[in-house]
C-alpha cells in the first residue's frame, strides 16, 4: 500500500481549489479511507484465503467455494471504490492546472503589451481583452483562481460523478456480500462431491470494518450532496446580486460624448477661442491676439458673442467718427474668456463700451460764429 503516497499528493493539491465542503470530503477520504485501508483493514484481510477452510478433502473444492463466496476481496473492492471516487476530483485538478497554464501565458502576453505600451503603441483594447479572458477563466490577482465559469461547471460535474460512484459501489457491495459476514458458508459446486460447509476467519472483526466503511461512504455521499446544493445556491445568489459577470455591467457604460459646441465645455475644458472678426475700419496688418488653449476641437466657441461684440465696437467707432488708425496698441491685449453669466449680461445691455470723447456734430449758429471771431483781450498777438 506504499503507492497511496502518489494519490495523496495529487489530492492534497485540490485543497487549495475546493470549497469548505470539498476540503471536509478530502479529509474524510484521507483519514477514514486511505489510512484505515492501508493499516488495519489490510491486516484483517491478510489471511483471507489461507484461513478459509471447508470440511472436505476434495482438491480444488476450497478454491471454488471461496470464489463463489467472495467474487472480489473486500480490500480490492474498496481500493477500486477510492480510485473511482477520486477520478472526478483529479479531473477537476487537471482543469485547474490548465487554467494556471493559461494564466502564465496571459501574464506573459500582458507584460509584452505593457512593454509595447511604453513605446507609444496603443494596446488598450488588447489589455482589456486579456482582463476579460482572465475573468472568464476565474483568474484573480496574485495567482489565485476563483471558481467561476467553466471551472465551476467542472467542479459541479465532479461532485455529481462522485455521488454516482458512491451510490453505485454501495449497491454493488450490497448485491455481492451484503453488509455483514457469516461464520459458515454453504457451498455446492463442482468439483465438490456434495454440499460442504466452509468457515471464515475473524468474521466479527471483518463485519465491524465493513460497517465502518459503509458509514464512511454514506458520510461522503452526504457531503457531496450538501456541497452540490451549496454551490448551486451560491451561484444563484451571485447571479441575483449581479456578481457573476461584472464585465457585462461595465462594458455597456460608455463615457458620455463631449459637446464641444457648448460654451461651458469650451470654457471649462480649455477650448481655444476662434479668431475674432476684424473691424471694417481696422488698419491693414492689424491682428487681435486671442487666447490659445491648445485645443482646436472647439473652434465655434462663443462665436456669436464675439461677432456681436465686434459689431457693437464698429458701430461705436462709426458713430464717434474716429478713424481706424487711432486704435492704440492697448487693444492688442490677450483675449479674455469671461464667465458665461457676465458675458450674457454684457450682451443683454448692449452699451457696455462707452465713447472716449463726446463730439458735438451739430453746425454752429451765426451768433456763435460772430462771437467767436471777435478779438478778446487775452488773445495772443503775433
Swiss-Prot record:
Relate the protein's function as given in its record. Gap junction protein that acts as a regulator of bladder capacity. A gap junction consists of a cluster of closely packed pairs of transmembrane channels, the connexons, through which materials of low MW diffuse from one cell to a neighboring cell. May play a critical role in the physiology of hearing by participating in the recycling of potassium to the cochlear endolymph. Negative regulator of bladder functional capacity: acts by enhancing intercellular electrical and chemical transmission, thus sensitizing bladder muscles to cholinergic neural stimuli and causing them to contract.
MF annotations from Gene Ontology: alpha-tubulin binding; beta-catenin binding; efflux transmembrane transporter activity; gap junction channel activity; gap junction channel activity involved in cardiac conduction electrical coupling; gap junction channel activity involved in cell communication by electrical coupling; gap junction hemi-channel activity; glutathione transmembrane transporter activity
Question: What pairs make up the disulfide bonds?
Answer: 54-192, 187-198
Q: Which residues carry this modification: Phosphothreonine?
A: 275, 326
- In residue numbers, the region (Interaction with NOV) covers 244-382
Question: What, per the annotation, is the impact of changing residue 352 to G?
Answer: In heart malformations
Result of mutating residue 239 to W?
In congenital heart malformations
- Give expression by tissue: Expressed at intercalated disks in the heart (at protein level). Expressed in the fetal cochlea.
Keyword annotations for this protein, in alphabetical order, are: Acetylation, Cataract, Cell junction, Cell membrane, Disease variant, Disulfide bond, Endoplasmic reticulum, Gap junction, Hypotrichosis, Isopeptide bond, Membrane, Palmoplantar keratoderma, Phosphoprotein, S-nitrosylation, Transmembrane, Transmembrane helix, Ubl conjugation
Location within or outside the cell? Cell membrane; Cell junction, Gap junction; Endoplasmic reticulum
- Cross-link Glycyl lysine isopeptide (Lys-Gly) (interchain with G-Cter in SUMO) position reads 144, 237
UniProt KW Disulfide bond keyword: yes
Segments carrying the region annotation (Interaction with UBQLN4) are 264-382
> After translation, how is this protein modified?
Phosphorylated at Ser-368 by PRKCG; phosphorylation induces disassembly of gap junction plaques and inhibition of gap junction activity. Phosphorylation at Ser-325, Ser-328 and Ser-330 by CK1 modulates gap junction assembly. Phosphorylation at Ser-368 by PRKCD triggers its internalization into small vesicles leading to proteasome-mediated degradation. Sumoylated with SUMO1, SUMO2 and SUMO3, which may regulate the level of functional Cx43 gap junctions at the plasma membrane. May be desumoylated by SENP1 or SENP2.
What does the record note on quaternary structure?
A: A connexon is composed of a hexamer of connexins. Interacts (via C-terminus) with TJP1. Interacts (via C-terminus) with SRC (via SH3 domain). Interacts (not ubiquitinated) with UBQLN4 (via UBA domain). Interacts with SGSM3 and CNST. Interacts with RIC1/CIP150. Interacts with CSNK1D. Interacts with NOV. Interacts with TMEM65. Interacts with ANK3/ANKG and PKP2.
Q: What is known to happen upon mutating residue 290 to N? A: In congenital heart malformations
The record's annotation in InterPro entries points to: Alpha_helix_dom_sf (IPR035091), Connexin (IPR000500), Connexin43 (IPR002261), Connexin43_C (IPR013124), Connexin_C (IPR034634), Connexin_CCC (IPR019570), Connexin_CS (IPR017990), Connexin_N (IPR013092)
Give the residue ranges for region: Disordered. Answer: 317-382
The residues on the Extracellular side of the membrane are 45-76, 177-207
What name is this protein filed under? Gap junction alpha-1 protein
Q: Which residues lie on this side of the membrane: Cytoplasmic?
A: 2-23, 98-155, 229-382
Phosphotyrosine found at: 247
Topology within the bilayer? Multi-pass membrane protein
One Pfam family matching this protein: Connexin
